[in-house]
């Protein structure tokens, strides 16, 4: 392999078509670097199960390689080599651990087989701590380095039981210990890493960290207001421009769908609440049992939108955007909302305030907080909403543009 090319193996995302933070990040990183001959990305994707990669739904895929059974095992996207990892489906939460271990094993085998010089293995999330010393030593023996993106308190996520949370916390400590550098997407996350793990690195060292945020676009969608694709989508979903509040994100408890739906139902708003997500039936039914939201015709689960220009236009035309994430660092969905939607209503936790500052309105999980904010927001005049939008876009352009973020990664990856 050409020693002048920096090979970077990206570990931890499920696919390139999902709404998770890492999926969005990898999509944009490979897009912005696709014509940089100094970099070659290798992206792991799930072959099966929840959130798996379906390359037929993503435009621009080439070089598809299939196995003897006709299943895609490898393809090219944004000039990145994407490879699929199959996972046993009957091992429950252990799937996440199995997935990362299987990816790292495949990465090490590939690096060895193709004699890749000075590879970087960039691991997103802290799931495989007990295996990290083994892989750290293996990758170093192959002449590589281990980079980590600590995902922002995986152990705090509501979906996990107490024993699993305990495992994630211990795993996080080991992951931070056995990495060459931790790239933190939030100043709050970087501070947390040092507060918790200074003096706990190899031979009692402090972890080496840098801050590089996620990015977002500030341009307008290429679709016009009367584009047939947009109008057809609106007709199909029963929505109209500026006639809906919006949320886009993974359908998991810690994103506070329960609070947002309950509070919207309490509000007096005449607008709809459009929810773009990959619905999990178990969680959906649990919410219905608690909230009986199906009786409120304003609440609309509208499925997924893989067309990025259409999704951007849907964001632009939303009256307001809700963001209920309370675990994690800089969230791509929030950045995209600030870059596209004028009025943003955010859960007032540190991570969200760090990103949006005074370019958004904030709510708490207290009863009536969001409902009251929705009713106030419905009464805002156009001038106030436009001013909020301009402020939000300025914030993104100054600190979170994808061009700026991708340039920072080039500097880091190519630093010798």
Predicted regions and their residues:
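Conserved donor-binding/catalytic core segment of Leloir-type glycosyltransferases
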Residues: 8-11, 229, 234-255, 261-268, ...
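A short, active-site helix/loop in glycosyltransferases that binds the activated sugar's phosphate group
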Residues: 177-208, 216-221, 409
């Amino acid at each position: 392999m050409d020693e002048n090319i920096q090979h970077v193996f990206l570990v931890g995302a499920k696919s390139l078509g999902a709404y998770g933070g890492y999926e969005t990040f990898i999509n944009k990183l490979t897009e912005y670097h696709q014509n940089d001959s100094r970099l070659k990305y290798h992206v792991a994707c799930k072959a099966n199960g929840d959130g798996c990669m379906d390359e037929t739904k993503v435009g621009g895929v080439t070089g598809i390689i299939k196995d003897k059974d006709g299943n895609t095992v490898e393809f090219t996207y944004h000039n990145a080599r994407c490879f699929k990892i199959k996972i046993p489906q009957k091992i429950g939460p252990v799937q996440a651990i199995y997935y990362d271990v299987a990816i790292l094993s495949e990465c090490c085998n590939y690096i060895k087989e193709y004699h890749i010089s000075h590879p970087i293995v960039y691991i997103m999330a802290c799931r495989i701590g007990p295996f990290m010393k083994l892989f750290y030593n293996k990758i170093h023996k192959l002449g590589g380095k281990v980079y980590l993106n600590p995902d922002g308190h995986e152990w705090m996520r509501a979906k996990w039981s107490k024993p699993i949370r305990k495992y994630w916390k211990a795993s996080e400590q080991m992951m931070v210990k056995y990495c060459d550098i931790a790239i933190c997407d939030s100043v709050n996350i970087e501070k947390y890493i040092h507060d918790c793990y200074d003096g706990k690195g190899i031979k009692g060292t402090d972890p080496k960290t840098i801050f590089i945020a996620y990015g977002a676009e500030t341009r307008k969608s290429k679709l016009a207001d009367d584009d047939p694709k947009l109008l057809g989508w609106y007709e199909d979903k029963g929505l109209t421009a500026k006639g809906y509040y919006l949320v886009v994100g993974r359908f998991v408890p810690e994103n506070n769908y329960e609070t947002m739906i309950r509070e919207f139902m309490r509000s007096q708003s005449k607008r709809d609440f459009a929810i773009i997500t990959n619905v999990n039936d178990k969680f959906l039914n649990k919410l219905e049992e608690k909230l009986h939201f199906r009786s409120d015709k304003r609440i609309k689960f509208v499925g997924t939108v893989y067309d990025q220009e259409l999704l951007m236009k849907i964001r632009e035309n939303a009256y307001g955007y809700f963001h209920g994430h309370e675990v994690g660092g800089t969230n791509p969905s929030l950045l995209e909302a600030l870059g596209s939607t004028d009025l943003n209503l955010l859960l007032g936790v540190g991570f969200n305030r760090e990103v949006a500052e005074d370019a958004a309105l904030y709510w708490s999980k207290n009863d009536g907080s969001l409902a009251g904010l929705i009713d106030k927001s419905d009464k805002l005049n156009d001038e106030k909403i436009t001013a909020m939008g301009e402020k939000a876009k300025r914030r993104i352009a100054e600190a979170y543009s994808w061009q700026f973020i991708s340039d920072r990664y080039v500097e880091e990856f190519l630093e010798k």
